[in-house]
């Protein structure tokens, strides 16, 4: 083949190809629409599918307006649903992820989150949700701290305050209870100290009493005599038989009661009194009245001794015994003085009866 002819054929083929290209210029192959576009993150798509699933409406679902979703049961959501989609069961981590994509908490009393691109029935808007990036000039540790503070401030701050208030009220109640118990314990300790101090004082008094008793050999003898005297007085009063006084001319019946006449230990024979009560002898009447009064005083003293004898030997008796320093001898001298007074009255009575005119 002639080389010149071959060159001509080649040029014609090139021209035809070039002309065909010019004719098919508008129908050249192009890439698919949206082929190089970036889709929504897997976290958003999984969360959207989870909220859209009607089988999980008891745990998580859309709100009535459809512009937010509500986690009704965080515990079941974290235990069952999160491990199935996100391979973890940390609800706080899920909330942190929502925070990084710009979700906000709508209701402080429940876990309700909203975003302008997260709407019911509009899945295509998920691509408008962008992940927030921290400033590039800040260190990673500071970025993490800012994220944590933002999460606590927006999503957990109210619940944390409520929990702290409850803990504070519980602690205040416990402190008040402990203070009451402390005051009761102080009062009990003070009462025990008072009782211990009183017991120590009694012990000191008892030791002093025993020391004085050992230094005084007559003490036990005097104590035994005193007890014997009391016993004799009790026996004498219980066995004494009184005779009623008959007509006494120098006593007014209105002045002396029958009980006083029966209580008198000095009872006189009516015949003797009639002999002594002659006209013109007023001294006999006065002496008889004095003797009667003296007898009443003696009965009162015996009754008082009986009462004291029946009482127990308490602290007052020992204190009186220690202070008076065994005054048994003085009581004996007083008793002798009373007997001497009675003898003197009897002598005067005999003198007057002997000198009275016949």
Swiss-Prot record:
Expressed in roots, leaves and immature seeds. A motif (AHA1) lies at residues 265-274. One of its GO terms (biological process) is cellular response to heat. Residues 164-214 are annotated as: Hydrophobic repeat HR-A/B. The keyword Coiled coil applies. One of its GO terms (cellular component) is cytoplasm. Signal peptide: none annotated. It is found in: Cytoplasm; Nucleus. Pfam families: HSF_DNA-bind. Its main location: cytoplasm. A motif (AHA2) lies at residues 315-324. The keyword Transcription applies. Exhibits temperature-dependent phosphorylation. A motif (Bipartite nuclear localization signal) lies at residues 229-243. Residues 1-39 are annotated as: Disordered. SUPFAM superfamilies: Winged helix' DNA-binding domain (SSF46785). Induction: By heat stress. Gene3D superfamilies: Winged helix-like DNA-binding domain superfamily/Winged helix DNA-binding domain. Residues 156-243 form a coiled coil. Belongs to the HSF family. Class A subfamily. The hydrophobic-rich region (HR-A/B) corresponds to the oligomerization domain. AHA motifs are transcriptional activator elements. Homotrimer. Transcriptional activator that specifically binds DNA of heat shock promoter elements (HSE). This is Heat stress transcription factor A-2c. It comes from Oryza sativa subsp. japonica.
């Amino acid at each position: 083949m002639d080389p010149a002819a071959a060159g001509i054929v080649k040029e014609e083929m090139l021209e035809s190809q070039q002309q065909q290209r010019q004719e098919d210029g508008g129908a050249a192959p192009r890439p698919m629409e949206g082929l190089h576009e970036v889709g929504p993150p897997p976290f958003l798509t999984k969360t959207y599918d989870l909220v859209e699933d009607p089988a999980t409406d008891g745990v998580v679902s859309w709100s009535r307006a459809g512009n937010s979703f509500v986690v009704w049961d965080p515990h079941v959501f974290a235990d069952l649903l999160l491990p199935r989609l996100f391979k973890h069961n940390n609800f706080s981590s899920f909330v942190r992820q929502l925070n990084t994509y710009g979700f906000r908490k709508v209701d402080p009393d429940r876990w309700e989150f909203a975003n302008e691109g997260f709407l019911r029935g509009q899945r295509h808007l998920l691509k408008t949700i962008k992940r927030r990036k921290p400033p590039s000039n800040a260190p990673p540790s500071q970025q993490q701290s800012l994220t944590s503070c933002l999460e606590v401030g927006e999503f957990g701050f109210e619940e944390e305050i409520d929990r702290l208030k409850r803990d504070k009220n519980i602690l205040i109640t416990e402190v008040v209870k402990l203070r009451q118990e402390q005051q009761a314990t102080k009062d009990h300790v003070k009462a025990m100290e008072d009782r211990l101090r009183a017991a120590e004082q009694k012990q000191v008094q008892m030791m002093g009493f025993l020391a004085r008793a050992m230094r005084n050999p007559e003490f036990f003898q005097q104590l035994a005599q005193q007890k014997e005297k009391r016993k004799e007085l009790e026996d004498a009063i219980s066995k004494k038989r009184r005779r009623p006084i008959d007509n006494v001319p120098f006593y007014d019946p209105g002045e002396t009661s029958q009980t006083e006449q029966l209580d008198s230990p000095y009872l006189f024979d009516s015949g003797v009194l009639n002999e002594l009560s002659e006209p013109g002898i007023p001294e006999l009447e006065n002496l008889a009245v004095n003797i009667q009064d003296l007898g009443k005083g003696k009965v009162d003293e015996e009754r008082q001794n009986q009462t004291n004898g029946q009482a127990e030997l308490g602290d007052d008796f020992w204190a009186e015994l220690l202070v008076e320093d065994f005054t048994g001898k003085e009581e004996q001298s007083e008793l002798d003085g009373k007997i001497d007074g009675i003898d003197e009255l009897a002598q005067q009575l005999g003198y007057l009866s002997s000198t009275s005119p016949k």
